[in-house]
């Protein structure tokens, strides 16, 4: 039985595989004979996470449960078809009431190869007193801001920019308060927060950073999947 003192997690996996050219949910696409979902859940557990709630497409819940049958203390619930933000809120509700200081992580199944050390760093930072923590990488490309017409309007200093990954970690009370404050945005993907740290920022919270990892790539397009398969084959 899980303890309230254990870190818990919401693993978002309700996305489609359309940009990968797949008819199945993206989280069920396989790497080395196992779905992305399984790899992501295994990585969370290895990093020190206890209970995990997975948000899945309503039509695929049984497939998801079957894919995770060899991982304990994990449950699958229906996610939202409106936004990731709303899916996370449903996952938090499924975790039930938690102590205010409980550490809760939010991770994307689309980042199946996140090293356990990244998860552990996030947990350690929250345990050390941070209310919200995100793993980040330096930006290597030059970035531009553009107008709706496509004209360049500015060049931000690259040294001030980072690329954000998951899992993101929070004190339970901080994340719940942030989701409650931003709940009205979740009904529309165009308005919804693209990550949970953004909701914390919106209520005036401080978000801290830890080092991410290049292996925590997000599988979105076919090239991402090809690279992830090479990395997974090397791990298997």
Residue ranges and their predicted role:
Residues 216-236:
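Hydrophobic helical membrane-anchoring modules
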Residues 1-7, 66-70, 186-189, 230-236:
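Short, low-complexity, intrinsically disordered N-terminal peptides in bacterial proteins
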Residues 69-103:
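Short phosphate-binding loop-to-helix
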Residues 11, 37, 91, 107-108, ...:
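Residue-level signal for inorganic ion chemistry
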Residues 208-215:
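Catalytic beta-strand/loop signature of glycosyltransferases that borders the donor
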Residues 113-208, 236:
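Conserved core of the sugar-phosphate nucleotidyltransferase
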Residues 10-14, 55, 106-107, 136-138, ...:
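Short beta-strand segments
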Residues 2-64:
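N-terminal glycine-rich phosphate-binding loop and ensuing alpha1 helix
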